[in-house]
UniProtKB/Swiss-Prot annotation:
Keywords: Antimicrobial, Disulfide bond, Fungicide, Plant defense, Secreted, Signal
Compartments (UniProt record): Secreted
The species this protein was found in: Arabidopsis thaliana (Mouse-ear cress)
Name of the molecule in the record: Defensin-like protein 226
Domain of life of the organism encoding this protein: Eukaryota
GO BP annotation list: defense response to fungus; killing of cells of another organism; signal transduction
Length: 92
């Protein structure tokens, strides 16, 4: 019985010591705000970079805005010019 109690207490102490050394970590960037905008043209091979530059060229956008974007082709009816959809996230 003594051995069982000592074993349980030692397990609790070891668990407490391990958990007391764990530190909370914040993410480096917080991608909290989403922006979905259509732009003319196709994505091509550098669609992400094109979306980022188009978002930064928007009126009122800060020049030092850090954005992460994905580019996808948008459905358009036959006879209309191609469009791409930029799905972007930025720190708000």
């Amino acid at each position: 019985m003594k051995c069982g109690v000592l074993f349980m207490i030692s397990c609790l102490l070891i668990t407490f010591l391990v958990l007391s050394h764990v530190r909370e970590v914040e993410s480096k960037t917080k991608w909290g705000c989403d922006m979905n905008r259509p732009f003319p043209g196709k994505c091509g091979t550098n669609g992400k970079d094109t979306c980022i530059s188009d978002i930064k060229k928007m009126p009122g956008a800060p020049k030092d805005l850090v954005v992460r974007c994905e580019c996808s082709q948008r459905f358009v009816w036959k006879g209309y010019p191609p469009e791409r959809l930029c799905k972007c996230q930025y720190d708000c």
